[in-house]
């Protein structure tokens, strides 16, 4: 999951919530020799206070995921982005499209294996159970990777900044 998330952050300059909010219907692979794969950013996944989610009366909330922590005051939600400008089409480099194709194949095999035990929300980045990742889980995976490989400490969001800098150079 971290490998896919890092590739999307760097290749497509996506925010963590945009990455976690991607569903497979947002991904469009090149067909018939066309070399243009792309994705549609139209949702974001974030963790919010349950009371705050209720207070919005469902405005812009597309889905509230079942809580995995008993007595938690927080919920993961899939919602529309804050602004209309955040909704956009992003072209996928071939290498990133290939990574996503391989990831999708593995995910479909897992869905086949687990059957009804897989909670299928059609998320691109889903845990082995089908449940969504939250940003804290991705941050933790990144920190573990950084420390295991003795790399400089960076934030996940810095991948987005590096991506933009690289594209401007």
What kind of region is each of these model predictions?
Residues 10-12, 45, 96, 129:
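Short, flexible loop/turn elements at secondary-structure junctions
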Residues 15, 96, 160:
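A generic "binding-loop/recognition-motif" signal
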Residues 1-2, 12, 90, 105-169:
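Short, basic (Lys/Arg/His-rich) helix/loop patches that form interaction surfaces
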Residues 22-109:
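Conserved tyrosine-mediated DNA breakage-rejoining catalytic core shared by Y-recombinases
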Residues 7, 101, 166:
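A cross-family signal for key residues in well-ordered alpha-helices
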Residues 15, 48-49, 99, 133, ...:
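Flexible loop/turn segments at secondary-structure boundaries
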Residues 1-16, 20-22, 32-36, 49, ...:
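Basic, Lys/Arg- and aromatic-enriched nucleic-acid-binding interface segment
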């Amino acid at each position: 999951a971290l490998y896919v998330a890092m590739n999307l952050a760097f290749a497509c300059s996506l925010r963590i919530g945009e990455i976690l909010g991607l569903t497979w219907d947002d991904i469009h692979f090149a067909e018939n020799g066309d070399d243009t794969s792309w994705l549609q950013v139209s949702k974001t996944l974030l963790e919010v206070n349950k009371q705050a989610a209720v207070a919005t009366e469902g405005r812009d909330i597309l889905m509230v995921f079942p809580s995995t922590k008993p007595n938690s005051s927080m919920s993961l939600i899939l919602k529309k982005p804050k602004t209309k400008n955040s909704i956009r089409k992003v072209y996928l480099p071939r290498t990133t499209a290939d990574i996503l194709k391989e990831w999708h194949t593995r995910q479909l095999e897992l869905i086949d294996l687990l059957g009804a035990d897989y909670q299928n929300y059609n998320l691109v980045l889903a845990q082995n159970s089908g449940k969504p990742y939250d940003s804290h889980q991705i941050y933790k995976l990144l920190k573990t990777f950084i420390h295991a490989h003795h790399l400089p400490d960076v934030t996940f969001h810095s991948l987005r900044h590096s991506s933009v800098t690289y594209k401007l150079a």
